[in-house]
A protein has these predicted regions:
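Beta-propeller blade signature
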Residues: 235-245, 291-303, 483-492
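Extracellular/periplasmic metallocenter environments
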Residues: 551, 613-655
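Structural signature of eukaryotic scaffold interfaces centered on beta-propeller domains
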Residues: 61-75, 119-123, 127-163, 203-210, ...
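A short beta-strand motif characteristic of beta-propeller blades
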Residues: 103, 144-145, 189-193, 249-254, ...
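Short loop/turn segments immediately following beta-strands, especially the blade-tip
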Residues: 98, 186, 299-315, 367-379, ...
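Short, conserved, GDST-rich strand-edge loop motifs in beta-rich repeat architectures
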Residues: 73-76, 165, 216-235, 274-293, ...
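N-terminal edge beta-strand
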Residues: 555-581
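N-terminal secretory signal peptides
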Residues: 1-15, 23-30
Length: 655
């Protein structure tokens, strides 16, 4: 519908978007709007959803912040942002407040620029920790590796409740994997399969004393081996996984009820959490949204570790699995009832509270972490842990924090960001006549995740908030039917939120982690003394009597040929080599440049091969020489004035 037709029908673009979103939510029945209409607050939320003016409740002489997003030429950002790439399979690195994209880190995807998914080093990461069942599937399917991924929820490693600059972790919902990215080189060094679970979604690292565990939610219920039956969905379960963040091996799994959504960990190292929908064990949208309540599952880490030591588990596909189902009356879990289909799960930076975002309810449920000991001891009931449940608006999905006692929640249906005070919400829950909502700000459009600077640590600084919006509509020049997402930068340093900048992003960010630049110290070149990524190349070179840093040698072993060369602008150390048609060829290239930002590449024409070789790195690729003739190779990185001359030839002699 055009803007002109919208206006003729008495609808603004925002009204149209809000109505469309609310209509879409209607498939869940009347639950969402019904809950929204259960009070005056709900009436206001429903009004906002239909396009009414936003509510602004600034207190006294409240003023917006005055931060600037401008980062001039040659100036540096104050924060790194680790942005999920969603179905692109990659992780993205941005600077804040400029919102400039600094780097794309290929992880679960195949990448033409760097050769990720084609080089031997990347294939070792992609396939080095997969199950035998996956290995057989890839072989039978004629695949070197999975060609795609759906990367959600990047989060950094912790020591003592704050980022330690070592690793970033993220999940692959499409193919049930978890990755680790080394922050010194911004490359994935480990990717593991998660057996028994389906649809790895929520992912969070342990905060204290360190990471520790990385917790991964299996979203989709399936017939877990030894428990479920293929033809009876009522016997299907989800699986919660704890991964050792240092070894990237699975420590344990817990069998649970319902579809696990998002999760978080406490600040004390005692508990972890997962929101859960589909308590009905249904297989359709309508069926999975019929109950008035679902739950949050709380996991007692000490009890689980003791259960593992005591042997209270079953080994399922090589993994130790404990029974955390409600029907088992498990000592490892507690199920806290919350309104229908909770989504986001966020711990406040003071370590006191867990926020469970309602999605189909206009509420956020606030859990008091200090009450969990009594809950597991049987001294109180599950809902006694709830200390607030403010009604904020339609479609609350995720909550972030400023470290000053305020929370910021995305309202998907209302297309708004709502700022509210946690203490006031607790007072209101006790019956005090206080409104916790401080301000509502329009965002554009339909926000999902949000994140504040350092907001997931004890060092939350309350400077910036980023809203990851699922629709951009009219915010940018029309780029065709597929529109970019819209990431919006909001200044939260003052009393009022202030929208500062719109940033288009390619499909599709699902989360963001904002860390002070001072917390990280990436290298400027690769370290030859830390050859983890090219360890196999180093070992093979030693067997062949080759020193990689001085290599210019071709080694033949039957029909296997290994070509060792170096790259120094503007030449490869081997300008030409010959092989026979049908040979298995491995090319090793070592970039011996010692200065930063002098990356080389190796592209072999007509063979679908291109790879990146960073300063002081070694990269390799293996292929079969099936095409006879002359095939040029060249450096695809513009590294020198004689860049185009940096080339050579592979001559393939026909049979």
């Amino acid at each position: 519908m055009s803007d002109e037709k919208l206006e003729q029908n008495g609808l603004s673009r925002r009204s149209f978007l809000g109505t469309a979103a609310a209509s879409g939510a209607g498939i869940a029945g009347a639950g969402l709007l019904g809950l929204a209409g259960c009070s005056k607050d709900g009436e206001q939320a429903a009004a906002n959803a239909s396009g009414a003016a936003p509510v602004a409740k600034a207190q006294g002489e409240s003023k917006p912040g005055q931060l600037s997003s401008e980062v001039g030429p040659g100036e540096l950002d104050q924060y790194y942002g680790f942005l999920s790439g969603g179905q692109s399979g990659e992780m993205r690195l941005i600077g804040l407040p400029s919102m400039r994209e600094l780097m794309r880190i290929p992880v679960f995807n195949m990448d033409s620029a760097t050769g990720w998914g084609r080089t031997n080093e990347s294939l070792k990461v992609l396939n080095g920790n997969i199950t035998e069942e996956t290995r057989k599937f890839l072989k039978d399917s004629g695949l070197r590796c999975y060609p795609n991924g759906d990367l959600h929820h990047p989060h950094l490693s912790f020591t003592d409740q704050t980022y330690d600059g070592r690793y970033a972790y993220a999940n692959d919902k499409a193919n049930n994997r978890v990755c680790r990215v080394r922050l010194d080189v911004m490359k994935a060094d480990k990717i593991i399969d998660i057996p028994n679970a389906s649809g790895i979604h929520g992912l969070r690292p342990q905060r204290y004393p360190k990471t520790g565990y990385v917790f991964a939610n299996g979203e989709h219920i399936t017939p877990v081996s030894g428990v479920g039956k293929l033809d009876d969905a009522k016997t299907w379960n989800a699986v919660y996984t704890a991964i050792d963040g240092e070894t990237m091996e699975i420590a344990w799994q817990v069998l649970v009820d319902g579809n696990l959504d998002n999760g978080d960990a406490d600040y004390q190292g005692k508990y972890s959490f997962a929101t859960c929908y589909n308590s009905e064990r249904a297989l359709t949208v309508q069926g999975a949204s019929s109950n008035e309540q679902d739950w949050c599952v709380v996991f007692d880490l000490k009890a689980i570790e003791e259960g593992i030591k005591a042997g209270d588990f079953k080994e399922v596909n090589g993994v130790k699995m404990l029974d955390g189902r409600a029907e088992a009356k498990s000592k490892y879990t507690r199920y806290i009832p919350v309104p229908n289909s909770p989504h986001g799960c966020n711990a406040s930076p003071d370590g006191k509270y867990i926020m469970l975002n309602g999605k189909l309810s206009p509420t956020v449920t606030v859990l008091d972490v200090s009450k969990l000991d009594d809950l597991f001891a049987g001294k109180i009931k599950e809902r006694d842990v709830v200390v607030a449940e403010p009604q904020l608006g339609l479609g609350p999905l995720h909550t972030a924090f400023d470290g000053r006692g305020n929370a910021y929640t995305t309202l998907f249906i209302d297309s708004q960001m709502v700022k509210w005070n946690i203490d006031d919400a607790i007072k209101a829950y006790k019956g005090d006549k206080v409104d916790p909502i401080k301000q509502k700000l329009d965002v554009h459009y339909q926000p999902g995740h949000n994140h504040t600077t350092m907001g997931e640590t004890k060092e939350a600084d309350g400077q910036w908030l980023v809203s990851l919006n699922k629709f951009s509509k009219d915010r940018f020049l029309n780029a065709g039917p597929l529109k970019p997402e819209c990431d919006q930068l909001i200044d939260i340093s003052g009393d009022e939120m202030r929208l500062v900048h719109d940033n288009p992003t390619f499909a599709e960010p699902h989360d963001l982690c904002l860390v002070a630049a001072s917390k990280l110290n990436p290298g400027k070149t690769w370290d030859r003394k830390d050859p983890w990524f090219w360890q196999d190349a180093l070992e093979q070179a030693k067997k062949d009597g080759v020193e990689l840093e001085k290599a210019a040698k071709v080694v033949r072993e039957g029909n296997k040929v290994r070509v060792y060369m170096t790259a120094v602008a503007p030449a490869f150390s081997i300008p030409q080599f010959e092989v026979n048609q049908g040979d298995e060829v491995t090319v090793y290239v070592t970039n011996v440049e010692t200065i930063e930002d002098l990356t080389h590449g190796f592209t072999l024409e007509g063979y679908g091969i291109a790879m990146e070789i960073g300063p002081q790195a070694t990269s390799s690729v293996t292929f079969k020489a099936v095409r006879p003739g002359v095939h040029w190779y060249y450096c695809q990185w513009f590294c020198h004035a004689l860049h185009m001359e940096m080339s050579g030839q592979m001559i393939v002699k026909p049979k």
